[in-house]
UniProtKB/Swiss-Prot annotation:
<comment type="pathway">
    <text>Amino-acid biosynthesis; L-arginine biosynthesis; N(2)-acetyl-L-ornithine from L-glutamate: step 2/4.</text>
</comment>
<keyword id="KW-0808">Transferase</keyword>
<dbReference type="GO" id="GO:0042450">
    <property type="term" value="P:arginine biosynthetic process via ornithine"/>
</dbReference>
<keyword id="KW-0028">Amino-acid biosynthesis</keyword>
<dbReference type="InterPro" id="IPR037528">
    <property type="entry name" value="ArgB"/>
</dbReference>
<feature type="site" description="Transition state stabilizer">
    <location>
        <position position="8"/>
    </location>
</feature>
<keyword id="KW-0067">ATP-binding</keyword>
<feature type="binding site">
    <location>
        <begin position="44"/>
        <end position="45"/>
    </location>
    <ligand>
        <name>substrate</name>
    </ligand>
</feature>
<feature type="site" description="Transition state stabilizer">
    <location>
        <position position="217"/>
    </location>
</feature>
<dbReference type="GO" id="GO:0005524">
    <property type="term" value="F:ATP binding"/>
</dbReference>
<feature type="binding site">
    <location>
        <position position="158"/>
    </location>
    <ligand>
        <name>substrate</name>
    </ligand>
</feature>
<keyword id="KW-0055">Arginine biosynthesis</keyword>
<comment type="similarity">
    <text>Belongs to the acetylglutamate kinase family. ArgB subfamily.</text>
</comment>
<dbReference type="GO" id="GO:0003991">
    <property type="term" value="F:acetylglutamate kinase activity"/>
</dbReference>
<dbReference type="InterPro" id="IPR001048">
    <property type="entry name" value="Asp/Glu/Uridylate_kinase"/>
</dbReference>
<feature type="binding site">
    <location>
        <begin position="181"/>
        <end position="186"/>
    </location>
    <ligand>
        <name>ATP</name>
    </ligand>
</feature>
<feature type="binding site">
    <location>
        <position position="66"/>
    </location>
    <ligand>
        <name>substrate</name>
    </ligand>
</feature>
Length: 258
């Protein structure tokens, strides 16, 4: 089996039928012309935000990471492992892709511990066991994995989806693409940066050009590139016509170098 490709989905993608249609069309085209196994990892911040708003619950973030109190982890699990995950499975079904919905704890695929008590039920993801997902891939299934994990003592944890995808890529020896709303990392003039190193990233963070959630994304990609010993791509799902090329290894966004 070729080494898998993990496609991490994020941003408002889950809110846009047009974007999902384009993405799954690109996935079908890619699967028809390539034997390479694919895995989807997703967050779903927009789904969670909508639900929290509907329930009049405050959304708090610290350093770009969502604060998850004990009384909210059930709601967030329902949104991510439930609504967001099953929405993607429904799209896969519509496009005749045999898929399986998972969370990080299934088959101990990703090991999770609490990241920081101040963040509540927010988990740190570490590589786990490849056995379950490899079995699914060998049988032609598309695993769709939500970024909810569970600790050894049975506590549910909300994990940053970029970090979850990184840990799963390390588990499977997979290549990683982080798909988001933006076409990559932009410089101070709004131009896409084709390649990024750790020192360049630090410089742009110090200058205030890379901020908030993008800092988390860049750090996750740098961590992934280091852990995997290979480049990681950050790109946009908006350019659907370019996605098959991206899945095939052609950079269309920002390539993060270890």
């Amino acid at each position: 089996m070729m080494n898998p490709l993990i496609i991490k989905l994020g941003g408002v993608l889950l809110d846009s039928e047009e974007a999902l249609e384009r993405l799954f069309t690109a996935l079908v085209n890619y699967r028809e012309s390539h034997q390479r196994p694919l895995v989807i990892v997703h967050g779903g911040g927009c789904v969670v935000d909508e639900l929290m708003k509907g329930l009049n619950l405050p959304v708090k973030k610290k350093d770009g990471l969502r604060v998850t109190p004990a009384d909210q982890i059930g709601i967030i699990t329902g949104a991510l492992a439930g609504t967001a995950n099953k929405t993607l499975l429904a799209w896969a079904k519509k496009h005749h892709i045999a898929s399986v919905g998972l969370f990080l704890g299934d088959g101990d695929s990703v090991n999770v511990t609490q990241l920081d008590e101040a963040l509540g039920h927010v988990g740190l993801a570490q590589p786990g066991s490849p056995k379950l997902i490899n079995m699914l891939l060998e049988n032609g299934f598309l695993p769709v994995v939500s970024s909810i994990g569970v600790t050894d003592d049975g506590q549910l944890m909300n994990v940053n989806a970029d970090q979850a995808a990184t840990a799963l890529a390390a588990t499977l020896g997979a290549d990683l693409i982080l798909l988001s709303d933006v076409s990559g990392i932009l410089d101070g003039k709004g131009q896409r940066i084709a390649e990024m190193t750790a020192s360049k990233a630090e410089q742009l963070i110090d200058q205030g050009i890379i901020t908030d959630g993008m800092i988390v994304k860049v750090n996750a990609a740098l961590d992934a590139a280091r852990a995997l010993g290979r480049p990681v791509d950050i790109a946009s799902w908006r350019h659907a016509e370019q996605l098959p090329a991206l899945f095939n290894g052609t950079p269309i966004g920002t390539r993060i170098l270890a």
